[in-house]
A protein has these predicted regions:
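Acidic (Asp/Glu)-rich catalytic clusters
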Residues: 109-120, 145-150, 204, 237-242
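Short acidic/polar active-site loop segments enriched in Thr and Asp
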Residues: 94, 151-154, 185, 221
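N-terminal chloroplast transit peptides
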Residues: 1-23
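A short, structured active-site edge motif that brings together acidic residues
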Residues: 120-133, 155-161, 224-227
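N-terminal binding-site loop/beta-alpha segment at the start of enzyme catalytic domains
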Residues: 2-4, 13, 43-122, 174, ...
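CE4/NodB-like, metal-dependent polysaccharide N-deacetylase domain
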Residues: 138-158, 177-181, 213-215
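Short, acidic/polar
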Residues: 77-87, 134-147
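Beta/alpha (TIM)-barrel catalytic core signal, keyed to glycine-rich beta->alpha loops juxtaposed to Asp/Glu
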Residues: 160-342
Length: 342
């Protein structure tokens, strides 16, 4: 199969090659008229919660940065995606989370391209590979670039740990190659259990040997999971934090299924906030990157109003539970020889 570079039209290669000569930092790209963003590395982030703003970023283990609040597009209709993403960008989000399986990458890309007053360097776009094997992962990177019209993808994740060991290793190799080619800036996984993560570390070491040395196997920059007080995933979180991997939390609002919970409601009343805002603040103070989803303009805005209050340590502790109650699919528990596709 041809290399990543040879499969793209010349115009895209010209754009990508410009990055090595300072394209993304050139003087004509002006910073938005916002307060200077506060940047934290993952290992100190949780202790700095009081300093958070909508412009805050977390430093990844590859030196790049990710906005600490994302706008999720799960189950957003393709025909709505551009409009709602544009609305999210208008109210201050700078981080958009999509996936091949969501079928709304094109709308997200159109909104990002249409945000003429926001430099591309200030916008963070994520997508995910659905079919976990080398060829499909390689093709998915190219398809996402074509559908979105973007010159690069900020973050590409393997959506689930399906595909078998050979498929997972091959898909990861494809992401590493895409990162090396400049098509993808950061890479990672979603819904991997500890056993899948352990296997991936082995694959990374194998790829280093096969591809010519340390660093050639890539590194997990970001990992994404359903995380909230009723699905804490402490074993996975500990594994990732030990390696300074940024953790994203999807379904941080538990699909609204916990509205009216006694503790949650009490905290909302105490702080004069909505239950959704309490859950998002909990996620931020745990050091996670929450990805709330809404297509309602008022809720899109309300989900950003989480920086003018702080939960106490006791609040955070009281909200946590011993429950394991995911509201979405849960591939983290699938065996290493599990399904070949999602």
């Amino acid at each position: 199969m041809a290399s990543f570079g040879t499969r793209f039209p010349k115009s895209r290669l010209q754009v990508l090659s410009a990055s090595s000569s300072g394209f993304f930092n050139s003087s004509h790209l002006q910073k938005p008229k916002l307060n200077h963003p506060i940047t934290f590395s993952a290992h100190i982030f949780r202790t700095m919660a009081s300093a958070l703003t909508l412009q805050s970023k977390q430093k990844l283990n590859n030196g790049l940065e990710i906005p600490v609040l994302g706008y999720g597009l799960w189950k957003t209709a393709p025909e709505e995606a551009e409009e709602v993403t544009t609305e999210a960008l208008k109210v201050g989000y700078r981080h958009v989370d999509s996936a091949a399986s969501y079928r709304n990458e094109a709308g997200a890309g159109a909104a990002i391209r249409g945000a003429k007053d926001i430099p591309r360097s200030e916008l963070f776009f994520t997508s995910k590979v659905r079919y976990i094997n080398y060829d499909d992962a390689k093709d998915q990177v190219e398809e996402t670039l074509e559908k979105t019209g973007l010159a690069y993808i900020n973050l590409m994740l393997l959506h689930c740990p399906y595909g078998g060991s050979e498929g997972r290793k091959g898909a990861w190799k494809a992401l590493v190659e895409a990162q090396e080619a400049g098509l993808v800036k950061s890479i990672g996984v979603s819904n991997y259990g500890v056993h899948h993560l352990d296997e991936l570390e082995t694959h990374i070491k194998e790829l280093e040997e096969e591809r010519g040395g340390k660093g050639k196997g890539g590194a997990i920059n970001v990992a994404q999971y359903e995380i909230h007080p009723w699905c804490a995933r402490n074993d996975i979180v500990q594994w990732l934090q030990k390696r300074n991997v940024a953790i994203e939390a999807y379904s941080p609002l538990v699909r609204g299924e916990r509205w009216g919970d006694k503790t949650l409601k009490a905290l909302a009343d105490k702080h004069g906030k909505s239950e959704a805002q309490i859950l998002l603040r909990w996620s931020l103070q745990k050091g996670y990157i929450p990805l709330p989803k809404s297509v309602t303009p008022t809720r899109i805005l309300d989900n950003t109003k989480i920086y003018d209050f702080q939960l106490s340590d006791e609040d955070v502790k009281n909200l946590e539970t011993d429950e394991y109650s995911p509201v979405c699919w849960d591939p983290t528990v699938s065996p290493l020889d599990g399904p070949k596709s999602g």
